[in-house]
Amino acid sequence: MSKQKIRIRLKAFDHTILDQSAEKIVETAKTSGAKVVGPVPLPTEKDVVTILRAVHKYKDSREQFEIRTHKRLIDIVNPSPKTVDALMRLNLPAGVDIEIKL
């Protein structure tokens, strides 16, 4: 018999909001009686953009900006309909991107 599993991937630029959201999901799943694996921290993506400070010349004067994307993975094993319903009604902050796979 195969076990059913819900895999949730969370992405955010701010790691504190991401960890709070992951904790809310874990608490909600555990109170409804499902087994939870995670949150597992995935590697952080770092995008670096280099631009020239001056408009025309002065190529030696540059500025670098970076944005980091933090990620977490949560697996919910053998979810009940009560678990799925509780997760659907969960309110999470706007800065968190959620991908759910069944």
From Swiss-Prot:
<dbReference type="GO" id="GO:0006412">
    <property type="term" value="P:translation"/>
</dbReference>
<dbReference type="InterPro" id="IPR027486">
    <property type="entry name" value="Ribosomal_uS10_dom"/>
</dbReference>
<dbReference type="InterPro" id="IPR001848">
    <property type="entry name" value="Ribosomal_uS10"/>
</dbReference>
<comment type="similarity">
    <text>Belongs to the universal ribosomal protein uS10 family.</text>
</comment>
<dbReference type="GO" id="GO:1990904">
    <property type="term" value="C:ribonucleoprotein complex"/>
</dbReference>
<comment type="function">
    <text>Involved in the binding of tRNA to the ribosomes.</text>
</comment>
<dbReference type="GO" id="GO:0003735">
    <property type="term" value="F:structural constituent of ribosome"/>
</dbReference>
<dbReference type="InterPro" id="IPR036838">
    <property type="entry name" value="Ribosomal_uS10_dom_sf"/>
</dbReference>
<dbReference type="GO" id="GO:0005840">
    <property type="term" value="C:ribosome"/>
</dbReference>
<protein>
    <recommendedName>
        <fullName>Small ribosomal subunit protein uS10</fullName>
    </recommendedName>
</protein>
<dbReference type="InterPro" id="IPR018268">
    <property type="entry name" value="Ribosomal_uS10_CS"/>
</dbReference>
<dbReference type="GO" id="GO:0000049">
    <property type="term" value="F:tRNA binding"/>
</dbReference>
<keyword id="KW-0689">Ribosomal protein</keyword>
<keyword id="KW-0687">Ribonucleoprotein</keyword>
<comment type="subunit">
    <text>Part of the 30S ribosomal subunit.</text>
</comment>
<dbReference type="Pfam" id="PF00338">
    <property type="entry name" value="Ribosomal_S10"/>
</dbReference>
